[in-house]
Amino acid sequence: MRTSKRDRIITGALELAHCDGFDSLTFDTLAEHVGLSRGGVIYHFRTKTELLEGIAAAFLERWRTQALAALGGPLEEASRTERIEALTRSVLDGEILPGEVSFMLSATPEAEMLKDAWNTLRREWVGELRELTATQRVALLAVDGWWANRAFDTDGLGPDEPAIADLIVSLVAGNLPDQKLFKPSDKD
């Protein structure tokens, strides 16, 4: 399937942000990067704010799609635990796109759009956090930590092992950990 110009612009903006940060992103550099005229970029996104809104919407759609794939069925038919497990699995197994971290950490007020998009998704899939057990809330923090570790660990030395991912999914479902998981690793 052919990529739309709008999608090309969003992807290009993320690639540039990954290299230079969102704060240095301009329509001119973006147009050159994606092979369009400045007017071609502005046709789809009249302002940088509209571009950032488009990026946030694209992330939200991608996150929803990944969570639905992990769920394997309609959201409306899933229990709360199934929704939380699916969202967790989609984050643990999902890809972090170039520029995703740059967008999250951008100093621009518009970067709040991505945080708002994530919070919207989390409310849809998790519900009220205060209603979860302490174990579940700690597991959700572990999901955030897993994502951050993968985003910043360029050496590939992070704790991204399947057993750890399975433990996080189990905890987020409200299950207590199996004692065998607490034995020290043979790795030094």
Each model region followed by its residue ranges:
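Short alpha-helical scaffolding segments that buttress acidic/His motifs in well-ordered protein cores
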Residues: L87-V91, E100-A107, A139-W146
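Hydrophobic/aromatic-rich alpha-helical bundle segments in the mid-to-C-terminal region
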Residues: P98, A111-D188
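Hydrophobic alpha-helical connector segments
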Residues: E61-E100
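Generic hydrophobic, amphipathic alpha-helix propensity
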Residues: K5-L16, L30, I55-F59, W63
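Solvent-exposed, amphipathic alpha-helical segments
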Residues: G12-D20, Q66-A69, A142-N149
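Helix-turn-helix
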Residues: R8, L16-E50
